[in-house]
Amino acid sequence: MSMSTSTEIIAHHWAFAIFLIIAIGLCCLMLVGGWFLGGRARARSKNTPFESGIDSVGSARLRLSAKFYLVAMFFVIFDVEALYLFAWSTSIRESGWVGFVEAAIFIFVLLAGLVYLVRIGALDWTPARSRRERMNPETNSIANRQR
């Protein structure tokens, strides 16, 4: 590497280096300033969690239903689908009919997956007993009278 090449690289990237130095320095200044100017109260009540004016009760380790994770996965999947379709829609003139067919196949595959999930009951939030009561209300009313 010759001297002129390294000088050119430094001349080309000096503004970014100054930006990084100032940003890191500003972050450090704010952290140190908060530490020096912040309160020093150390009491037992200061170490307890407090949220929205309510004292916490019980453990923070709650077991959530797997259906919440299922909804999160569906959101991510369909959000990524929307991103792909947005990228396709911005370049529709360049991609032409081939791009349209590819996007249609992509949508068809995702819709087939959605239909499959509906058919196996992955999107059904109600328990099986409640679903049966909703489907056959007359048989359930007879069963309830016999109890």
Swiss-Prot record:
Membrane topology: Multi-pass membrane protein
Ranges that cross the membrane: 16-36, 68-88, 98-118
Keyword Amino-acid biosynthesis: no
InterPro entries referenced in this protein's UniProt entry, alphabetically: NAD(P)H_OxRDtase_bac/plastid, NADH_UbQ/plastoQ_OxRdtase_su3, NDAH_ubi_oxred_su3_sf
Record's catalysed reaction(s): a quinone + NADH + 5 H(+)(in) = a quinol + NAD(+) + 4 H(+)(out)
Keyword Transmembrane helix in annotation: yes
EC class of the enzyme, as a word: translocase
Gene Ontology MF terms in the entry: NADH dehydrogenase (ubiquinone) activity; NADH:ubiquinone reductase (non-electrogenic) activity; quinone binding
EC number(s) recorded for this UniProt protein: 7.1.1.-
GO cellular component: NADH dehydrogenase complex; plasma membrane
Subcellular location: Cell inner membrane
Binding partners and assembly: NDH-1 is composed of 13 different subunits. Subunits NuoA, H, J, K, L, M, N constitute the membrane sector of the complex.
Record's function text: NDH-1 shuttles electrons from NADH, via FMN and iron-sulfur (Fe-S) centers, to quinones in the respiratory chain. The immediate electron acceptor for the enzyme in this species is believed to be ubiquinone. Couples the redox reaction to proton translocation (for every two electrons transferred, four hydrogen ions are translocated across the cytoplasmic membrane), and thus conserves the redox energy in a proton gradient.
Protein name: NADH-quinone oxidoreductase subunit A
Name of the gene this protein is made from: nuoA
